[in-house]
Amino acid sequence: MLTDREEQILDLLRRDPLMGSEALAAALGTTRASINVHISNLGKKGVILGRGYVLAESPGAVVIGGANMDLKARSQARATSHTSNPGHGSMAPGGVARNIAENLARLGDRVHLVSVVGRDPLGENLLSHTAAAGVRIEHVARTDRPTGTYTAVLDVDGELIVAIADMAATAELGPDQVQAARDVIASAGVLVLDGNLRRDALEHALDLSGGVRTIFEPVSVPKAAALKDALDSRLYAVTPNRDELAALTDLPTRTDRQVRTAAATLHARGVELVWIRMGGRGSWLLTTDELIEIPALRADVEDVTGAGDSMLAAFCHVLLDGGTPEQAARFGHAAAALTVASAHTVRPDLTPRLIRATLEQKELP
């Protein structure tokens, strides 16, 4: 794991690999001697390959699935059904796969997005924003269908009342688009597949994933049910909530015992990790022989949209950095707490340093 100072140095070197130790020291308000010690340590860790400075290319992540525009409306008071409610609206790039990719980029990871958007102003806006955040978008295809939209209605406290997803453009994402990304998939450290994928696209991605830790994010109950038969030993992890777990396994998940039984059926299919969102209780991380309960972190909720996406992105970030699944899950909870406290679906100031500080602060007795 890198220290906060090492990550700050790497961030500067990514922008300017020829930056010298004196300039680094000035930018960070420290001494050249201190910078040289950190540079030496980064070399020992294999992150910097030489002076100049040459940064080692980490395996990075590939995320395949939905990219759309989020349209959010929030009520000014407790919402009343079957009538209009005063409130305010906003629009920003979204989509589960795209959100995960942007979060990973903001955490400093190399990430490719594989998706489809329309040849329309919404698609242009989405791609411009996503690329500016650091996501590689050369494998995002264009279609004549309109760019997908996710319309969410939030109550006064930021909790979701209802959402409607129009993912017609993502339905254009088939095996051919996945095949075009085969080289970046083969070299990835983590591959994330979201439940917006068609069955044939999901199957093809799994066929290309040999040797790559592959994670399936179900997205919703209907989408989990549609793809449940594709889950097998090609997957490293599955990340459902309780309702999605029931849809994936055709088993009840009302009690804790039932949740464990349902998770065991995924293990029996060859899935190594089942990471279950348990609502206010936090999450369960299950292997074939261990259950780790991870409590949710307290947060002042501004908007719950995107919390699960940041949680999974932070999980992947720690895996790419060599951490354990438990470390990754705890890091994910801290990222989710930061995200729900923000009005943004992807928190723009999200960094590993901020997440670590939040984790340390909220885990204090």
Question: What do these predicted regions represent?
Answer:
Residues 1-21, 27-28, 33, 37-54, ...:
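Conserved phosphate-binding/catalytic region of the ribokinase-like
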Residues 3-6, 10-15, 19-23, 27, ...:
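Glycine-rich phosphate/adenosyl-contacting loop at the front of the ribokinase-like
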Residues 57-59, 69, 79-88, 106-189, ...:
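Conserved N-terminal subdomain of the carbohydrate kinase-like
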Residues 28, 89, 115, 140, ...:
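Glycine- and other small-residue-rich loops at beta-strand/loop junctions that grip anionic moieties
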Residues 67, 243-244, 289:
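Alpha-helix/helix-capping structural signal
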Residues 190-261, 281-283:
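Conserved beta-alpha-beta core of the PfkB/ribokinase-like small-molecule kinase fold
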